[in-house]
Amino acid sequence: GEAPAPHDARIDAAVGRGLRFLARTQEPNGAWVAIIGRKVLRSYEGTPGHHVGVTALACLAFMAGGSTPGRGPYGRNVERGLEFVLASTLENGFISAHNSRMYSHAFAALFLAEVHGTTRDSRVREALQKAVGLIVSAQNAQGGWRYLPGVPDSDVCVTVCQVQALRAARNAGIYVPKDSIDRAIEYVRKSWDPRTGGFFYQLPQSRLSFQLTAAGLTALYGAGYYEGPEIDAGLRFLVREWPIYYRAPQTFDYYYGHYYGIQAAFQRGGSFFSEWHRRIAGELLELQRPDGAWSDYVGVNYATAMATLILQIPYQYLPVFER
C-alpha cells in the first residue's frame, strides 16, 4: 500500500487533546460511559451506562495512535478497556453490557481482532472466536444483520460493522466462512440505488443518505469488492451530499457517517483522499471543544473516540484501516 499520510502538526495537536480527554474520562472498571439506547427519529434515547461499544472505539482510537495493551503512551488505558470488554463477553459469544446490541458487539469484536496480533493473551483469541461465531450465526436470510441476533430483517448500517469485524478477524487469523462474506456483499450490492448512486437503509427501497452510502462502500471494500459501478457512483454521491447534510448541529449520524466516509475515501486514495481528509480535518478542528472533546447525542466519549479515529485513519497503525 501507499505510505502513511504525513503528520500535520495541527491535526496531531487536536488528536493529542482528544486522547488526553479520553484518558481522563475512563472509569475505574476500564469502561467509558455513554448513552446506551437507540436512535429515535432525529434524536437518540437511552440511559447513560458503561458502554462496551464506546469502550472499544476509545481503545481503537488509542491504538490508531500506536498504543497497544501495556505499551505506548496509552497502553494502560487500552489494557483496562480490554479487561472490561473481556468481562462483558457472554457465554454464547455476545459481547454486551447493559443491553447494548449488535453495533456494540461488532465494535468490540473489531477491537479484539486488532488487539489479537499485539498480545499472547489466550483470552483474547477465545473471546474473538466466540464473537465471530455469534456474528456468523446472527446473519439472516437476506445476508445482512440488524440490531439484535436472530432478527429476520437487516440494514446496511449494522451490516457494515459486522463485515468490518469479520474482515479484521480474518486478517488476525480467525476462520471466517467465505459464504458469510459473499452473502453480505450480495446484500449490500442489492441495497445500492443505480438512480442516485446512494445506498438504501433497508430493502425494499427506503431512505438513502450520506452515512448509509459511506457504510455501504466501506462494507464492499472490506469484503474485497473494489471495482464496480456501485463504487464510483457511491463516491460521487458522497461528494454531492456532504455539503447539504453534513454541518452542525451534529446529528447522531455525523461521526458515524464520517468514520465510514473517510475509510471509503481512503480506499480510493490519491487526490480524492487528500482533499477529503483536508476537508473533514478542517471541520473537526472547528468542532473540537476547549477541553479536547467533541460532543453529540450519544455523549462526549463516543464523539471524541470517533473524531480522533477519523483524524488518525491515514496513519495506518491499525491493520483494518490499511489499503
Residue ranges and their predicted role:
Residues 1-20, 33-77, 90-133, 137-183, ...:
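An alpha-helical repeat/solenoid feature that recognizes helix-turn-helix modules
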Residues 21-25:
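Alpha-helical segment of the N-proximal tetratricopeptide repeat
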Residues 26, 89, 192, 288:
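Acidic, divalent-cation-chelating loop motifs in proteins
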Residues 75, 82-84:
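Active-site-surrounding "flap" and adjacent substrate/cofactor-binding loops of secreted or lumenal enzymes
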Residues 285-289, 295:
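Predominantly the C-terminal beta-signal and adjacent terminal strand-loop region
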